[in-house]
């Protein structure tokens, strides 16, 4: 796996699923391929994106700044600086300085990532802030190692939280989660459907599913009534794809 592929993988792992994630993936691909060279426009676009947490925006801004060539005096962006200040915690800043000194001795991406993984996400973000604010310099490879370690720390905590939700025995939370998943699956089906005759069929199924979820929420239903909703939808989607000659069996 190439270095940039690895960076893209880690960064996208902390972006919530949805149309925005696809858009960010495209921007990252363009930046890494050298197709997008207007850093200012890119940062303005990033700043105004909804849904993303300030820290995720800060990390993306840091990656864009590392990758897109820019004039020496280009102004640093406040939204990135604020996100990478370790919540203003002096403890994070102390650790960030110690980490920075260690990173100065590293020359490889994997070496830097290994060193950085023993620090908390707050200290890692502060260290990125040091580099972003030009208070310290490391090679691009080492900076990318720091980025990936930070994303791994964040993705780990997100995964723990998702796992807690998936394994919860609370029937109301499970019910709501199934309805949310069914609704987002229906939305994805509508986006994929296109405009053929079979597409109308897929759109109809998706639309009915969304109406059903809406009705279930409006009148309040038994927590077990949502069981299998998403799977039924995915089966419909796969049947539609088969008719279109597309074989994708990996949605479940």
Swiss-Prot record:
Q: How does it sit in the membrane?
A: Peripheral membrane protein
Report the main location listed first in the record.
virion
Q: What keywords sit in the KW lines? A: Host nucleus, Membrane, RNA-binding, Viral matrix protein, Virion
Residue ranges for the region (Membrane-binding) are 1-164
The motif Nuclear localization signal: which residues?
A: 101-105
Please give the GO cellular component terms listed in this UniProt entry: host cell nucleus; membrane; virion membrane
Q: Which GO terms describe its molecular function?
A: RNA binding; structural constituent of virion
Name the domain of life this protein comes from: Viruses
- List the residue ranges of the region (RNP-binding): 165-252
Annotated InterPro entries? Flu_matrix_M1, Flu_matrix_M1_C, Flu_matrix_M1_N, Flu_matrix_M1_N_sub1, Flu_matrix_M1_N_sub2, INFV_M1
Record localization: Virion membrane; Host nucleus
A Gene Ontology biological process noted in the UniProt record is: viral budding from plasma membrane
The protein's role, per its UniProt record? Plays critical roles in virus replication, from virus entry and uncoating to assembly and budding of the virus particle. M1 binding to ribonucleocapsids (RNPs) in nucleus seems to inhibit viral transcription. Interaction of viral NEP with M1-RNP is thought to promote nuclear export of the complex, which is targeted to the virion assembly site at the apical plasma membrane in polarized epithelial cells. Interactions with NA and HA may bring M1, a non-raft-associated protein, into lipid rafts. Forms a continuous shell on the inner side of the lipid bilayer in virion, where it binds the RNP.
Relate the assembly described in the record: Homodimer and homomultimer. Interacts with NEP. Binds ribonucleocapsid by both interacting with genomic RNA and NP protein. May interact with HA and NA. Cannot bind NP without genomic RNA.
* Misc. remarks from the entry: Most abundant protein in virion. When expressed alone can form virus-like particles in transfected cells.
As for family, the record states: Belongs to the influenza viruses Matrix protein M1 family.
Its recorded name reads: Matrix protein 1
